[in-house]
Amino acid sequence: MAARIGPMAGLLCVRWWSTAQLAARGGPLVACRRWTSSSTDSVYDVVVSGGGMVGSAMACALGHDIHFHDKKILLLEAGPKKTLEKLSETYSNRVSSISLGSTTLLSSFGAWDHICNMRCKAFRRMQVWDSCSEALIMFDKDNLDDMGYIVENDVIMHAITKQLEAVADRVKVLYESKAVGYAWPGPFSLADSSPWVHITLGDGSTLQTKLLIGADGHNSGVRQAAGIQNVGWNYDQSAVVATLHLSEATENNVAWQRFLPSGPIALLPLSDTLSSLVWSTSHAHAAELVSMHEEEFVDAINSAFWSDVHHTDFVDSASAMVHHAVALLKPTKVSARQLPPSVAKVDAKSRALFPLGLGHAAEYVRPRVALIGDAAHRVHPLAGQGVNMGFGDISSLIHYLSTAAFNGKDLGSMSHLTGYETDRQRHNTALLAATDLLKRLYSTSTTPLVLLRTWGLQATNAVSPLKEQIMAFASR
């Protein structure tokens, strides 16, 4: 069991394994008792609870996997089926940054082609800089290949839904259906050799499955029912999102992010004339931003990207010294600051806000249970990795489940589920820890910390191999 501990064991990966503890920690939906099976129960090889982007993609990937051609898969979604008959001229304010690794997953079951035929915007550079100094880091590709894509969540869901319909003979989708109870047939420690998980739906019907996959968000009922501890905290911040019109048309292929003392602000390209805003700030300031008149809101955005009000002469002088030292040590060209586009107006009714926090499940798997996406981890949007982490979970879990199916193994066995957990916890805990550290490091204008992060950012920007490693890690 020790091998399953992630790198932040003391903080994010606490484990509890005794049967007594597991029984004591049963969540509000769990009933750890023997279940008398009914012949009327529907039986599935895999049930995915939660039909958002990650849950739907999980079910779709299983349905398109060659080794699952003879399996029965069920996707449970509490909401109604969403249809997108045609694209609105107005862009949605909820978008995702899709990494190259995520495009590989979406391409594997045909969804990426639908997305490309609808709309998405590639970005080829990413500039991140500090509002308290001249320090910056520029991520780009030597050959100016695409680094990633900004896609509306509705477009992603439509593409996945189309591909789910293509495997309707293998994947059944129950919309407006929510699990209200889960029952494991005995102590978790014995479940590898026991009957299956039993699920009760809101209409009173019941079903059984060899493997239950929880993709039901950061308030996951599956995680609570399994008694899996979740470590997390709120950031006392909200993210303000909006769709913005630029002052003039540009190639608009750069993703911009500036760290303010109140939180990061990001501008993500949607088209040559439109960008999406994600501004993380205090709850009070977020509410103020959402209620501002349009002119005030636009002025606040432009000021956040352009103003040097947080600069000090001392920090600027120290930053200049390091810049000159780097230039002497590395005579080759170091990425220089580019100027972000200015904003002219905001789409009507596109402003919204949502609270921010961090969360991480101590375990991703139990016998016959696996967690993916926000059910397993919740991250600050400054990393732009929320849905990419979920898609990375899918890629890993599909690998282990496909191998198990090919070898005729029990899909709910810990013998392969632990491989998925180890793989993803190593990646996700590192990303969560780095994101949380950056959030805290940049949430201050204290001079010693400003100097520390300024020198760190300048040094990182000068070391191309290190930047390439960061980009490669983020794309997994």
Curated annotation (Swiss-Prot):
Origin: domain of life: Eukaryota
Coarse class of the protein's main subcellular location: mitochondrion
Transit peptide: 1-42
EC number from the UniProt entry: 1.14.15.45, 1.14.15.46
Catalytic activity: 4-hydroxy-3-(all-trans-decaprenyl)benzoate + 2 reduced [2Fe-2S]-[ferredoxin] + O2 + 2 H(+) = 3,4-dihydroxy-5-(all-trans-decaprenyl)benzoate + 2 oxidized [2Fe-2S]-[ferredoxin] + H2O; 2-methoxy-6-(all-trans-decaprenyl)phenol + 2 reduced [2Fe-2S]-[ferredoxin] + O2 + 2 H(+) = 2-methoxy-6-(all-trans-decaprenyl)benzene-1,4-diol + 2 oxidized [2Fe-2S]-[ferredoxin] + H2O
Cellular compartment(s): Mitochondrion inner membrane; Golgi apparatus; Cell projection
Transmembrane segments: none
Record-level GO BP terms: ubiquinone biosynthetic process
Pathway: Cofactor biosynthesis; ubiquinone biosynthesis
MF GO annotations: 2-methoxy-6-polyprenolphenol 4-hydroxylase activity; 4-hydroxy-3-all-trans-polyprenylbenzoate oxygenase activity; FAD binding; oxidoreductase activity; oxidoreductase activity, acting on paired donors, with incorporation or reduction of molecular oxygen, NAD(P)H as one donor, and incorporation of one atom of oxygen; oxidoreductase activity, acting on paired donors, with incorporation or reduction of molecular oxygen, reduced flavin or flavoprotein as one donor, and incorporation of one atom of oxygen
Cofactor requirement: FAD
One Pfam family from the record: FAD_binding_3
Protein's membrane topology: Peripheral membrane protein
GO cellular component, one term: mitochondrion
Keywords, alphabetical: Cell projection, FAD, Flavoprotein, Golgi apparatus, Membrane, Mitochondrion, Mitochondrion inner membrane, Monooxygenase, Oxidoreductase, Transit peptide, Ubiquinone biosynthesis
Enzyme type, top EC level: oxidoreductase
Tissue expr: In the kidney, expressed almost exclusively in glomerular podocytes. In the inner ear, expressed in the spiral ganglion, as well as in stria vascularis and spiral ligament cells.
Alphabetical list of InterPro entries matching this protein: FAD-bd, FAD/NAD-bd_sf, Ubi_Hdrlase_CS, UbiH/COQ6, UbiH/COQ6_monooxygenase, UbQ_mOase_COQ6
Family listed: Belongs to the UbiH/COQ6 family.
NCBIfam families on file: COQ6 (TIGR01989), Ubi-OHases (TIGR01988)
Biological role stated in the UniProt entry: FAD-dependent monooxygenase required for two non-consecutive steps during ubiquinone biosynthesis. Required for the C5-ring hydroxylation during ubiquinone biosynthesis by catalyzing the hydroxylation of 4-hydroxy-3-(all-trans-decaprenyl)benzoic acid to 3,4-dihydroxy-5-(all-trans-decaprenyl)benzoic acid. Also acts downstream of COQ4, for the C1-hydroxylation during ubiquinone biosynthesis by catalyzing the hydroxylation of 2-methoxy-6-(all-trans-decaprenyl)phenol to 2-methoxy-6-(all-trans-decaprenyl)benzene-1,4-diol.
PANTHER family: UBIQUINONE BIOSYNTHESIS MONOOXYGENASE COQ6, MITOCHONDRIAL (PTHR43876:SF7)
Subunit-level organization: Component of a multi-subunit COQ enzyme complex, composed of at least COQ3, COQ4, COQ5, COQ6, COQ7 and COQ9. Interacts with COQ8B and COQ7.
Protein name per the record: Ubiquinone biosynthesis monooxygenase COQ6, mitochondrial
Gene that produces this protein: Coq6
